A protein has these predicted regions:
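Hydrophobic packing and interface segments
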Residues: 1, 6-590
């Protein structure tokens, strides 16, 4: 059965890319819509009790989490079923079909990644431009409270919270979620390429999808477990969120063992423990981020103490603290990579295919509870905007006190969510790097090359060549100057990208500062409350600034791998990906 006919997979690639980007954008849109409605309801609920405010804000954030995982798994399932029907089975090599399906589906992940890139960069520029403009002129120069309706940039600031921390974070984790499942499925198919055991190959492909599906249900259970008492402190509030997250994590561990046992997957016990490793790494990164960013712990308290001697010492201490804070997450990810590889390979480091599958399944484990993990992050801007609504609508001091407590919690959960997103992206990136080799296999097959002539004189069939064979064929070693050049370029790219986006924020924020000053100067009666500021103008400045400034950094991230591949070939691209992944990971945590 060849439903695709002579047109091949070309149209499928285009449609997968578009659907990946579309569903990523749709999840961000729905999350923003929910967050916009929820902030007013959270402020209203905070009039009754802190617990009601927390539950409304958190469950509204859960909408974002569940939309992301639901749409992601829906689209993955749709394309798998469609491609399984459309692609014919090769009678001579039946295991090749699953490799073609899983590598083809990576195009869907590329669409999601592209959308995440634009959402993250554009959303970040929008958010920070509005934030800097509102705080620098309103709070510092004019001396009015935060979220005061007299500040022209207040609405832009509140909108920016949703754009950057809801839509941007949602698109980011949507990409990591889908990427981890797709890369692990591709590595599972590759682990059994050329073997007669196509049933075991199918089990390896379907396992990450089943774990993710069960994770959605267990995330919902954890969401309903979140509650707190009145007058709770920061540690109690953090504990209430941790209760839901930990409950989901424990349940997914049990469920993973049952799923892989029922599947009868080869080495299922060790692979189940690899999932546990992924979950533990995620928890460690979250707790580490919480420790370094929460006001309840020593690092932030010492940073606040340094403010007694002036802003210079705060900046110096903050940079130093940020650098130190990278230690635990990096050690956690490194340990997770080694342990998951070692477990899935059956304690045999030479079994590269299954070892890489273990790293991928660890990333799936880390993201299996994304439904509730993303809820804790999307909760942040909802609580923040609820405080703004309480301030602008003149609700009582008790309400503002409750929303401030929720907002303070939201700042910590936002930092935790970012750390979690970065850690999961590191494992997913490594799995995608390995699956890049599978794309090379498919590419060589389509070009008509059937044999690999290795440097040691051995010839290997392209379909049955191992990961090591491809590394030998392309001379991917540290002694190859192409690999080293790619690694240096990748390391540099992370810093160049950050520098460009920071400069973009600076330029957009400067326009915002000028506009707020202009309105204070030209519209008489704003500071006395007799005249209304032009909020729309500030929103327009942030929007145009974000759209204009995000183009060059985003295009740079897309074009760099293509240019490197054309100049240095496959070794250069692999070096670029390794360098970008390692330096980008540390820089992102910092």
């Amino acid at each position: 059965r060849d439903v695709l006919g002579s047109r091949g997979l070309g149209d499928v690639y285009k449609r997968q890319f578009l659907t990946g980007g579309f569903f990523s954008g749709l999840s961000g849109f729905l999350g923003m819509k929910t967050a916009t409605y929820a902030s007013a309801r959270t402020a209203n609920a905070a009039q009754h009790s802190l617990n009601k405010g927390l539950r409304v804000a958190f469950r509204s954030g859960a909408v974002m989490g569940l939309v992301v995982v639901g749409l992601g798994l829906l689209d993955i399932s749709f394309w798998y079923i469609l491609l399984d029907y459309c692609i014919p089975t090769d009678a001579l090599n039946p295991s090749a079909k699953l490799c073609v399906i899983t590598t083809t589906m990576l195009t869907f992940g590329m669409g999601a990644s592209t959308q995440a890139l634009f959402a993250r960069v554009g959303g970040g520029i929008y958010t920070k431009a509005a934030d800097v403009g509102a705080d620098l002129v309103g709070k510092v120069e004019a001396g009015i409270p935060e979220d005061d309706p007299r500040n022209p940039a207040t609405i832009a600031d509140n909108v920016g919270d949703n754009v950057g921390d809801v839509a941007g974070m949602g698109a980011d984790l949507y990409e990591s979620y889908c990427g981890s499942i797709l890369a692990t499925a591709a590595l599972g198919a590759a682990a059994f390429i050329g073997s007669d055991d196509t049933v075991m190959q199918f089990k390896a492909v379907i396992a990450p999808m089943l774990i993710a599906a069960v994770g959605i249900v267990l995330s919902i259970i954890g969401i309903f477990a979140v509650r707190t008492k009145e007058n709770a402190g920061m540690k109690e509030l953090l504990g209430s969120l941790a209760t839901g997250t930990n409950l989901s994590s424990v349940l997914i561990v049990v469920a993973t063992f049952l799923i892989l046992w029922a599947l009868g997957l080869e080495n299922w016990v060790n692979i189940s423990f690899a999932v546990v490793v992924g979950l533990i790494v995620g928890i460690v990164i979250g707790r580490s981020t919480e420790y370094y960013t929460s006001q309840s712990y020593k690092p932030t308290q010492r940073l606040a103490e340094s403010g007694k001697t002036g802003p210079a010492t705060v900046i110096i201490s903050g940079i130093g603290l940020g650098m130190v804070s990278t230690t635990i997450p990096v050690l956690a990810v490194v340990t997770g990579i080694i342990l998951s590889y070692w477990l899935a390979s059956g304690f045999d480091f030479a079994n590269i295919s299954m070892g890489l599958y273990g790293i991928g399944i660890a990333a799936v484990g880390m993201l299996s509870t994304l439904g509730i993990t993303l809820a804790t992050d999307a909760y942040g801007p909802i609580a923040d905007n609820a405080g703004g609504n309480a301030e602008m609508s003149g609700l009582g001091k008790e309400v503002r006190k409750r929303t401030d407590a929720l907002d303070s919690l939201g700042n910590t959960t936002a930092a935790t969510g970012k750390g979690f997103a970065i850690g999961s992206a590191a494992l997913t990136g490594l799995a995608l790097l390995a699956s890049y080799v599978e794309e090379i296999r498919i590419g060589l097959t389509r070009l008509g090359q059937t044999i690999l002539e290795l440097p040691n004189g051995i010839t290997v069939d392209v379909h049955n060549a191992s990961f090591t064979d491809y590394m030998l064929y392309y001379d991917v070693t540290l002694m190859n100057p192409k690999v080293l050049s790619g690694m240096f370029l990748g390391s540099m790219m992370a810093f160049l990208f950050c520098g460009l986006t920071m400069n973009a924020v600076g330029r957009a924020a400067a326009h915002m500062v000028e506009e707020v000053r202009r309105q204070f100067r030209e519209i008489k009666g704003i500071l006395t409350g007799e005249a209304e500021p032009d909020y729309a103008r500030c929103v327009q400045i942030s929007t145009k600034g974000a759209q204009r400034e995000m183009v060059f950094p985003s295009l740079l991230a897309i074009i760099a791998p293509i240019a490197t591949g054309l100049i240095f070939g496959v070794p250069g691209v692999i070096g670029l990906l390794i360098g970008g992944l390692s330096s980008g990971f540390v820089l992102a945590i910092f």
